[in-house]
Amino acid sequence: MPEALQELAAHVRMRQPDAILGHRVEFGELTLDVVPNRIVGLVEFLRSDASCRFSSLVDITAIDHPERPARFDVVYHFLSMYQNQRIRLKMQVREDETVASIHSVHPSANWFEREVFDMFGILFTGHPDLRRILTDYGFRGHPMRKDFPTTGYTEVRYDEVQKRVVYEPVKLVQEYRQFDFLSPWEGADYILPGDDKART
């Protein structure tokens, strides 16, 4: 399988040299680093080229790296049922940079791009209806950004007296504390009181 993915990477780089910055094969999937302003043409090529035929858009997401000048990675996942292969396209964009929508090539990108906009605040130019999809219309901020406060900005609750949903600023009964526990996946090297199973 890695040989087939390396051949695919070589084919794409040969046919779309201006769109690809680099590639790697990890965990049985090919990742292409893409020039942001070439994304639409590359996606069209991956869909229509006979050696590719990546006709299924699986997901679009983003990764926040606040310490980098190009803060976000926008990541596209595609599937070729004809070639039985997956491909990941990854591009770095600045916070003030827009990304071209691939809605014209994959109409299902509509929902994924709206989600990325809602969660990260990344704007997609050429999108037919770029508005929030998971949070309320008046929601402040973008909750998947690493600088978004854990408590949020607004508390939403049903008020029994007013018989409606009310929005209020978050009021913490005690100062917010950040706990630094051991990872639950690494497991503890001590026995908790009352944990009889650990002693047997």
Swiss-Prot record:
Keyword Cell inner membrane: yes
GO molecular function terms attached to this record: NADH dehydrogenase (ubiquinone) activity; NADH:ubiquinone reductase (non-electrogenic) activity; quinone binding
Listed InterPro entries: NADH_DH_suC, NADH_quin_OxRdtase_su_C/D-like, NADH_UbQ_OxRdtase_30kDa_su, NADH_UbQ_OxRdtase_CS
Superkingdom of source: Bacteria
Broad class of the protein's primary localization: membrane
Record's subcellular location: Cell inner membrane
Record membrane topology: Peripheral membrane protein
UniProt KW keywords: Cell inner membrane, Cell membrane, Membrane, NAD, Quinone, Translocase, Transport, Ubiquinone
Any Pfam family: Complex1_30kDa
Reaction(s) catalysed (UniProt annotation): a quinone + NADH + 5 H(+)(in) = a quinol + NAD(+) + 4 H(+)(out)
Keyword Metal-binding: no
First-tier enzyme category under EC: translocase
Record's GO cellular component terms: plasma membrane
Its EC number(s): 7.1.1.-
Function: NDH-1 shuttles electrons from NADH, via FMN and iron-sulfur (Fe-S) centers, to quinones in the respiratory chain. The immediate electron acceptor for the enzyme in this species is believed to be ubiquinone. Couples the redox reaction to proton translocation (for every two electrons transferred, four hydrogen ions are translocated across the cytoplasmic membrane), and thus conserves the redox energy in a proton gradient.
Entry-linked PANTHER family: NADH DEHYDROGENASE [UBIQUINONE] IRON-SULFUR PROTEIN 3, MITOCHONDRIAL (PTHR10884:SF14), NADH DEHYDROGENASE UBIQUINONE IRON-SULFUR PROTEIN 3 (PTHR10884)
NCBIfam families per UniProt: NuoC_fam, PRK06074.1-5
Assembly: NDH-1 is composed of 14 different subunits. Subunits NuoB, C, D, E, F, and G constitute the peripheral sector of the complex.
Protein family according to the UniProt entry: Belongs to the complex I 30 kDa subunit family.
HAMAP family to which the protein is assigned, alphabetical: NDH1_NuoC (MF_01357)
Protein name (database record): NADH-quinone oxidoreductase subunit C
The organism of origin for this protein: Cereibacter sphaeroides (strain ATCC 17023 / DSM 158 / JCM 6121 / CCUG 31486 / LMG 2827 / NBRC 12203 / NCIMB 8253 / ATH 2.4.1.) (Rhodobacter sphaeroides)
Gene: nuoC
